[in-house]
Amino acid sequence: MVEKEEAVISEEEAAQYDRQIRLWGLEAQKRLRTSRVLLVGMRGLGAEVAKNLILAGVKALTLLDHEQVSSEDSRAQFLIPSGSLGQNRAEASLNRARNLNPMVSVEADTENINQKSDDFFTQFDVVCLTSCPSDLLVRVNHICHKHNIKFFTGDVYGYHGSMFADLGEHEFVEEKAKVTKAKPLVEDGPEAKKAKIDPTETILVKKKVQFCPLKDALEIDWRSEKAKSALKKTPTDYFLLQVLMKFRTDKGRDPQPSSYQEDSELLLQICSDVLDSLGVSPDLLPKDFASYCFSEMAPVCAVVGGVLGQEIVKALSLRDAPHNNFFFFDGKTSNGIVDCLGSK
């Protein structure tokens, strides 16, 4: 993790971030203004995360993507101007990203992340990967966990989206309303029976939480008695994520509308194989699940990108309890759920 320089907020920055400073405090904003973030994958979800971090006021954001702009990107990637087909996605996103907040340093990196050394990641406070295969996610997460770098990953598949966080051993503060005790003069009166909570007076409470690596969260032994007892409470989107990540690993891409019939059949086969290998019922996912997993839908990107951006801001500012460790969103029902999976 990079060494933090002394944070100073100028008058111009104080005016720019006035609303945020009122929300989470000057010290939290100072932490953001000294933070460097790596964002990998500039598709629709990546664009949403980039927007939220730039507007929040991090010090520097690096957009890393070696892929070229495709027609599919026009569905949800609002940072890429029309007429950019064939250009590098990170470079095509750069101008609009910088215009969101000139106070944030935004750079593009067009190199393939697979060719980055372990040392490359140590210059960042947060590393966030989107639209990446599981083996790459596990590798980068291992590097980040080793060097105490906050790690996030997120994906959107059609109506479904998810995010995962590994913050290692994370300390933060929560703002709580101050409870005042009854005065001795009225301890025998009716007021003594009431706990007085003054919402206008608050205190900061320090807390600590431990996160597990992504590998542990993905490799749960669902045949164990402990896991079986938790299965009914586990969101089915966790298993859907496993299926879609296996598809990405096998095909080197996500399900595409242009090959809908072929990909739907393959998803059903992969689903059967994955659920069987995990030791869970083949009926865990509905038979029509494949119909809702194609393309990045802009509204789902907005929701998941909003949550992902919010969690990164919370992790950097050390304010408020983080989501530990998964967040799943179902666009069909407009429901989101946080669940902790894989922790000991």
Swiss-Prot record:
Per the record, its GO cellular-component terms are: cytoplasm; SUMO activating enzyme complex
Q: Which UniProt keywords apply?
A: Ligase, Nucleus, Ubl conjugation pathway
Associated pathway: Protein modification; protein sumoylation
Keyword Ligase among record annotations: yes
Q: Give a GO biological-process term.
A: protein sumoylation
Q: Which residues form a coiled coil?
A: none
Its annotated compartments are: Nucleus
Q: Which InterPro entries match?
A: ThiF/MoeB/HesA (IPR045886), ThiF_NAD_FAD-bd (IPR000594), Ubiquitin-activating_enz (IPR035985), UBQ/SUMO-activ_enz_E1-like (IPR000011)
Q: Can you say what this protein is called? A: SUMO-activating enzyme subunit 1
Q: What is the lineage of its organism?
A: Eukaryota, Metazoa, Chordata, Craniata, Vertebrata
